[in-house]
Amino acid sequence: TVAPNNRMGIDNYLEMEGLVYRVTFEESAERTSMPRLNYNRMIQNISETDDYNSLIYHPEDYWNHINAGHGIYRYTNLNNPDVYFNENIQRLIQNYRSSFLQLGLQNLYSSDEDGKVKTLEILDKMENYFPQDVIPTTDAELDIQIGRIYKQAGQPEELKNRLKSVQKRKDISLETQMYIGQIYMNEFQDYDAAIEHYEKLYDEYPYIPDFLYTLVQAYAKAERRSDAVELLEEWLGSHPNDSQAVDWLSILASPLQQ
């Protein structure tokens, strides 16, 4: 892992080929915040070999593998549920996942008409090498972002599954909790799931107005105006100077326009 400030200003001469950068003599055509990606070489360098009996001892062995189109890595036991992985190893595995995610995004935003299919193939390969139930993603927000990539590639249910998994975690921030509800409400229009999520948060943190506001929004979008009005009236009983709540109550309590 190389921090941007440790690249000594040679970003435009770096090329990602797997888990390492290669320093090249060729400058990138476009200046970006990240070094360019050698897609084909990277695919080979992070894919598991299909022949465990063919070992790489010498440089020519490596090039024979490359020229034959074979994968290089041997991800031994990283999908074995009987092996214990401590927190440090779990964090290191995120570096492996990062390479797969870069390739997935490259496909997703490319002009290739099969880009989404290729993205799903790469993500499924990643899940096969490092199953989520064996080596969990240590960062809850990264877990959600992986789900969002699945959704963009055509598998929205994978995002929902990951949201449900993240909701069970004890280490997620309140900002992430808020974000989860917004995804249910705005991306899936699953107002029942959003309401259930925000009701739990509001019960646990009744003093945080943002959870009240988002729960009111979810009630309103689900056409449960009476619940939204009741919640606002209850809140204003102890927070009479909350101008935003007053404004929302005046709107939601007014008769519907025919």
Describe each region flagged by the PLM.
Residues S110, A153, E187-F188, A222, ...:
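Structural motif corresponding to the intra-repeat A-B loop/turn of tetratricopeptide repeats
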Residues T1-Q152, E158-S165, D171, K200:
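ER/secretory pathway lumenal C-terminal domains and tails of membrane proteins involved
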Residues Q106, I149, I183-Y184, A218, ...:
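Residue-level signature for tetratricopeptide repeat
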Residues Y129, R169, E204-Y205, S238:
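Structural marker of alpha-solenoid helical repeat scaffolds
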Residues L101-Q102, P136-Q145, L174-Y179, P209-Q217, ...:
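Alpha-solenoid helical repeat scaffolds
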